[in-house]
Structures are given as structure tokens and as C-alpha cells.
Regions:
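Phosphate-recognition beta-domain surfaces
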Residues: 1-116
Length: 116
């Protein structure tokens, strides 16, 4: 799961969101629900990657990438560690889904809508 304060979509580019985070309510390794920290690196703003032919993609190394038409292929993947930290003692590429590449049955992305 992810929580962002910016709208997803548009041309191919990275977007920085200083308040974003990934979180896990349930996972294959039975770690209790937690929020995954965003590693802030000077000069790198890689919270979210947008591309017209991609699904939601988070982190500079595509830490969590949901492919286009994700329920019909195994191109979605997780590779934590570039922007978002895996919990101590957990393998970065399998923590969220139990395997590096996966076919999601459901995807939820949340963002905050504010009224001016």
C-alpha cells in the first residue's frame, strides 16, 4: 500500500512528495502492520514515478512497481531499498509480496485531496 499527497499520472518523470510513505498491513512474512520509511537523499527526489504506460510506481529504483494491466501479467515487482527501507532483517525484494515479481489481485493507492 502507499499514501501520497500528489496526483499520479502524466508524462514520464519522477515527482517528489516529502510526506509520502509505503505501508504494509499484511505481508507474506507475517511482520505486523508498519510504515516503510522514505530515505531522503540530497538532490534526489524520487518518491513517485509517473509514466503513461505504467501503473503506480514508487521510489527511485522502482521500489514498488505495479505494471500496466497488472492482473494479467507478472511484471509488477518490489525492490525496496532505493527510496523506501525494508524492515530490519527482511529481504528487500520479497518483503511486500513474498516474491520479487507478482500478479496483484487488488491495488490501492491513496492520496489526500485538500480544499482551498
Amino acid at each position: 500500500f502507499c499514501f501520497v499527497f500528489r496526483h499520479l499520472g502524466g508524462s514520464a518523470r519522477y515527482i517528489d512528495d516529502p510526506d509520502d510513505f509505503l505501508f504494509s498491513l499484511a505481508n507474506k512474512v507475517n511482520v505486523k502492520p508498519l510504515k516503510l520509511a522514505h530515505r531522503r537523499i540530497a538532490g534526489r527526489s524520487h518518491s513517485i514515478y509517473t509514466h503513461y504506460n505504467y501503473g503506480p510506481t514508487f521510489g527511485g529504483g522502482h521500489d514498488l512497481h505495479i505494471s500496466n494491466h497488472a492482473n494479467s501479467n507478472s511484471h509488477s515487482h518490489t525492490h525496496l531499498g532505493h527510496t523506501y527501507k525494508a524492515p530490519p532483517g527482511q529481504q528487500a525484494n520479497i518483503f511486500l509480496a513474498g516474491t520479487h515479481h507478482f500478479v496483484p489481485s487488488e491495488v490501492e493507492a491513496f492520496y489526500l485531496v485538500t480544499k482551498n
